[in-house]
UniProtKB/Swiss-Prot annotation:
UniProt organism field: Danio rerio
Coiled coil: none
GO molecular function: DNA-binding transcription factor activity, RNA polymerase II-specific; RNA polymerase II transcription regulatory region sequence-specific DNA binding; zinc ion binding
Keyword entries, A-Z: Developmental protein, Metal-binding, Nucleus, Repeat, Repressor, Transcription, Transcription regulation, Zinc, Zinc-finger
Record's keyword annotation contains Lipid biosynthesis: no
Name under which the protein is recorded: Protein odd-skipped-related 1
CC annotations in GO: nucleus
Family listed: Belongs to the Odd C2H2-type zinc-finger protein family.
Amino acid sequence: MGSKTLPAPVPLHPSLQLANYSFLQTSNGLHLPADHMPSIYSFSALHAVHLHQWTLGYPPFTLPRCTFSKLPGLVDARFPLPSIPLFPHLVQPAKQESSGPGSGASSKSKPRFDFANLAAAATQDDALKAEDLSTNNGHVRSPSLGCLLDVAKLSSPERKPSRGRLPSKTKKEFVCKFCGRHFTKSYNLLIHERTHTDERPYTCDICHKAFRRQDHLRDHRYIHSKEKPFKCQECGKGFCQSRTLAVHKTLHMQVKELKPAKIK
């Protein structure tokens, strides 16, 4: 069974001061001027016409130029029609479209809503809206859509901060006033500056030899006590300083590398 478009329902509005319902049926194809509408019918009549257009799914009520004399027999003379200013949300004037090669194809009239096939009509309406959005992708967007896009940009992955550790704080650098060398600790800077000033605050009680660092004085005291706490595990030789033992171990490693070469 084919779809059949139902006739337009008669809007029941008590304040609609029109002669008969033929005005609404005629207004679908009639073009009325926006500046002459207050002299034809009142505010409530405009509201009823607006609801009539919206219910049937017609496009906005475009009103080109014409005169009141071209409307004979549409309005009953027995009912006075007061002049009330129009409001932009009730009657929307037609927008001036720029004349161009694609201007005629861009203007599409919205089809009537088919009450017999509600599901098909609703699906068709959504498809048209999606098509309009796709065609207007390169044109100027509305402010509300722009705000939504701005919010979407803010929530996009590109704007989100990277997870994980926060960036490390800038470390305090201690700069030598003599050579400009940087140090992360003040103690290291103090020891380094003593190389420039030749300051040796740590002195041996036995031989009165001075040292820049306290650990150097501690290692020196092992010489006088003849105590050698750092001993080599391979040859048993003792050393007063750990760094001297480290240099000694490198000699053993070099000997082990030379032995396989001699055997070959």
